[in-house]
From Swiss-Prot:
This is Chorismate mutase AroH. CDD domains: AroH (cd02185). This enzyme is monofunctional, and its activity is unaffected by the end-product aromatic amino acids. It comes from Bacillus subtilis (strain 168). GO terms for cellular component: cytoplasm. Changing E78A: No chorismate mutase activity. It catalyses: chorismate = prephenate. Its EC number is 5.4.99.5. Pathway: Metabolic intermediate biosynthesis; prephenate biosynthesis; prephenate from chorismate: step 1/1. Keywords: Amino-acid biosynthesis, Aromatic amino acid biosynthesis, Cytoplasm, Isomerase. The lineage of its organism: Bacteria, Bacillati, Bacillota, Bacilli, Bacillales. It is found in: Cytoplasm. GO terms for biological process: amino acid biosynthetic process; aromatic amino acid family biosynthetic process; chorismate metabolic process.
Amino acid sequence: MMIRGIRGATTVERDTEEEILQKTKQLLEKIIEENHTKPEDVVQMLLSATPDLHAVFPAKAVRELSGWQYVPVTCMQEMDVTGGLKKCIRVMMTVQTDVPQDQIRHVYLEKVVVLRPDLSLTKNTEL
């Protein structure tokens, strides 16, 4: 098995606990579905949020996923880059897998599709 990174990101319209958790959970569920990821294969998960999000830690959404309570998770603040995407939540999931790197399915939803138009799933913003 190899260690691979699975990337994902989404945006919210409002800085509310409900929307941040809902959009983060939606993103995580799509990453899990697309990559057939099981909690026991996840080494760690890093989540970041842009500085304009304060209502809740996005990592709280991981705890709402059945069986994911033992996955090591941490949150951090994304760099505040001039012209950068606002109200954005990013995920880096480190997993053990036999899947070749070029077959990992990264997931970019909502306004984030502009960040990685080269990846196939960025074309699909509907779940």
